[in-house]
UniProtKB/Swiss-Prot annotation:
Cross-referenced CDD domains: Ribosomal_L13
GO biological process entries: negative regulation of translation; translation
Keyword Ribonucleoprotein: yes
Cited PROSITE patterns: RIBOSOMAL_L13 (PS00783)
Taxonomic superkingdom: Archaea
Protein purpose: This protein is one of the early assembly proteins of the 50S ribosomal subunit, although it is not seen to bind rRNA by itself. It is important during the early stages of 50S assembly.
Keywords linked to the UniProt accession: Ribonucleoprotein, Ribosomal protein
Natural source organism: Methanococcoides burtonii (strain DSM 6242 / NBRC 107633 / OCM 468 / ACE-M)
A GO term, aspect molecular function: mRNA binding
Keyword Transferase among record annotations: no
GO cellular component, one term: cytosolic large ribosomal subunit
Name under which the protein is recorded: Large ribosomal subunit protein uL13
Alphabetized PANTHER family for the sequence: LARGE RIBOSOMAL SUBUNIT PROTEIN UL13 (PTHR11545:SF3), RIBOSOMAL PROTEIN L13 (PTHR11545)
Length: 139
């Protein structure tokens, strides 16, 4: 089992690497999901997520999550063939957590190569936790 600390990692790059791991058969747990970052302007990012969240109706969807762990899991799902058996099995091997659960306190965390926040050329970024709070989550 691979345990990844999402603190300071770019969400999209993290998600694509995790999707590859899952499709190859690995079990992956991601901790500190609220500390992963989305690159870009804070205002623009908030507006984009507000549009996505308010799309559709309560009755018919689409249903978009507000909690940071579920936002990250939904992002990984978008990079998998989740409607097919292979993708469903891969999603079953993924666990995402806000903070660090008790069972992972002593685990050795792995970082994803090439997904560090230091590769951003500017300081324009927002954490998933901030986006989640903007959407009304109380995590």
């Amino acid at each position: 089992m691979t345990v990844i600390d999402a603190n300071g990692l770019i969400m999209g790059r993290l998600a694509s690497n995790v999707a590859k791991m899952l499709l190859s058969g690995e079990e992956v747990s991601i901790v500190n999901a609220e500390r992963a970052v989305i690159s870009g302007s804070k205002v623009t990012t908030f507006e984009e997520y507000d549009v996505i969240r308010n799309m559709g109706t309560r009755e018919f969807g689409p249903y978009f999550p507000r909690r940071p762990d579920r936002i990250l899991k939904r992002t990984v799902r978008g990079m998998l063939p989740y409607k097919r058996a292979r993708g469903k099995d891969a999603m079953g091997r993924l666990k995402v957590y806000v903070g660090i659960p008790y069972e992972y306190q002593d685990a050795e965390f792995v970082s994803v190569e090439g997904a560090e926040m230091t590769r951003l050329s500017s300081n324009k970024y927002v954490t998933i936790g901030d986006v989640s709070r903007q959407l009304g989550s109380k995590f």
